Amino acid sequence: MVRSVWKGPFVEGSLLKKADVARSSGRHDVIKIWSRRSTILPQFVGLVFGVYNGQKHVPVSVNEEMVGHKFGEFSPTRTFHGHSGDKKAKKA
């Protein structure tokens, strides 16, 4: 279900503060965040965020195509090792 337009996008307050500090200082360090549910805003374009996936912070550099999506979409939490193959097909 899509979020109501009148509510606006959800962004963690601390995330906005961290992004403003990074923009004003001009430093291009990775901004560590734990808020995977926050929406990517246009003012985040060009910044690099370290999005926590449960084990480590995955670096995500934000571009214009990511605006409107959530940070969690770009930091997978599960590793897929593939389905087990058919052993009969491998031998033949």
UniProtKB/Swiss-Prot annotation:
Disulfide bonds: none
Keyword match Ribonucleoprotein: yes
UniProt GO cellular component terms: cytoplasm; small ribosomal subunit
Origin superkingdom: Bacteria
Gene3D superfamilies the record matches: 30s Ribosomal Protein S19, Chain A
InterPro entries the record matches: Ribosomal_uS19, Ribosomal_uS19_bac-type, Ribosomal_uS19_CS, Ribosomal_uS19_SF
Alphabetized UniProt keyword annotations: Ribonucleoprotein, Ribosomal protein, RNA-binding, rRNA-binding
Flavoprotein keyword on record: no
Gene Ontology molecular function, alphabetical: rRNA binding; structural constituent of ribosome
GO terms, biological process: ribosomal small subunit assembly; translation
Function: Protein S19 forms a complex with S13 that binds strongly to the 16S ribosomal RNA.
Family designation: Belongs to the universal ribosomal protein uS19 family.
Protein name: Small ribosomal subunit protein uS19
Source species of the chain: Rhodopseudomonas palustris (strain BisB18)
